[in-house]
Design a protein with these regions (language model features):
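Compositionally biased, intrinsically disordered low-complexity segments enriched
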Residues: 2-14
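N-terminal pre-domain segments of enzymes
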Residues: 26, 41-89, 93
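A short glycine-rich, aromatic-capped structural motif
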Residues: 93-159, 171-174, 256, 263, ...
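Residues embedded in well-ordered beta-strands
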Residues: 105, 139, 206, 260, ...
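Functional-site microenvironments in short loops/helix caps that host divalent-cation chemistry
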Residues: 113, 117-121, 159-162, 167-302, ...
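Short, structured beta-strand segments at or near domain termini in extracellular proteins/domains
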Residues: 311-321
């Protein structure tokens, strides 16, 4: 069933999400140059730490990391084909970047269908079903970037809801570009195909874990549940990154809590290979604490201007291999 309400009716106007410009190639994204006009002076960049002196670190294609787990353990409900695909890469599954403190999980190449069918409640015209091919492995952060991690690199904290373990928010695309560059070479936004691939974790339902949202395990506006799902609390703020249960691939809060900036292809057709024009819009994925359930679907996407920032807008780091 098509969504009968517009965006302004289904998420709070003051907290709406954005659009920007980015360059991409394959599933690897080259961050665009931020506009000087819109760039905020958030950063007092901290010098990179001398992590190369730590001999306990492991080299992953030129990226020095500490290995947390070589393969997923029984605490992650990962299907056997995914486990086999990760093992075949001969790369550590769970690693920590010593400079930022951010934990990353390995995603192997694979295929997935993104978007939603026309009869999915909340479906929009820009959610056409597309069969996609993830050509290269990549690492994606286990959670959205926290304020503690942001301050470690950037110094200043722009967030409205303040707490070291809470996701950093109220950040624009330009702010996030500056942050990724300060983290070092190779860090970037995830492509929206990569994001949805990791969010769905092999599922084809509106949400990675079910056909409905449970407000006890997803932070969204529980007064507006999905279809005939049960209502729940409206927490009115973010919760700590990693505090909600992970999906079957180990990623936390892919639904709700905070919208996540991602890079989009220039057209829906270009999404099939995660490839597209050098001038593309940046989208937000996942929904937030302020949104109705249908805005938190795996397929849901919103675009805004690159200087847009709100207390519902954050991001999750990625790194190519």
């Amino acid at each position: 069933m098509s969504n009968t309400s517009n965006t302004s009716e289904t998420h709070r106007t003051s907290d709406a999400p954005c659009q920007t410009t980015k360059a991409i190639h394959g599933a690897s994204i080259a961050s665009p140059q931020p506009s000087r006009k819109h760039q905020r002076s958030l950063f007092t960049l901290h010098p990179l730490r001398a992590w190369w002196r730590n001999r306990s670190l492991v080299d992953v294609h030129g990226w020095r990391v500490s290995v947390i787990a070589k393969l997923p353990d029984s605490s992650v409900a990962m299907p056997p084909p995914m486990l086999a695909a990760i093992a075949a890469l001969n790369l550590p599954w769970k690693v920590r970047d010593p400079n930022t403190g951010i934990v990353f999980l390995l995603c192997p190449p694979g295929k997935c269908t993104i978007g939603s069918s026309s009869d999915e409640d909340g479906h929009k015209d820009d959610e056409t079903l597309i069969a996609c091919n993830i050509k290269h492995p990549f690492y994606l952060a286990e959670t959205t970037t926290t304020q503690e991690q942001w301050e470690r690199i950037a110094g200043a904290n722009p967030s409205v809801h303040v707490g070291p373990k809470l996701p950093v928010e109220n950040v624009s695309v330009n702010d996030c570009i500056a942050f990724t560059r300060a983290c070092g070479p190779g860090f970037r936004f995830p492509h929206e195909v990569e994001w949805e691939y990791a969010c769905r974790a092999g599922s084809d339902t509106p949400f990675s874990h079910a056909k409905h949202l449970d407000a006890d395990i997803v932070n969204y506006n529980g007064r507006h549940p999905y279809r005939d799902g049960p209502p729940g609390p409206d927490r009115l703020h973010t919760v700590a990154a990693g505090s909600m249960p992970a999906n079957s691939w180990g990623f936390h809060e892919m639904h709700g809590n905070i919208w996540e900036w991602c890079v989009a292809a220039a057209t829906r057709v270009a999404l099939a290979s995660a490839d597209g024009d050098a001038s593309v819009a940046t989208v937000m994925r996942g929904g937030s604490w302020a949104n109705h359930a249908h805005n938190c679907r795996s397929a849901s996407r919103l675009t805004r201007a690159s200087d847009y920032s709100r207390k519902t807008a954050g991001f999750r780091l990625a790194r190519g291999i």
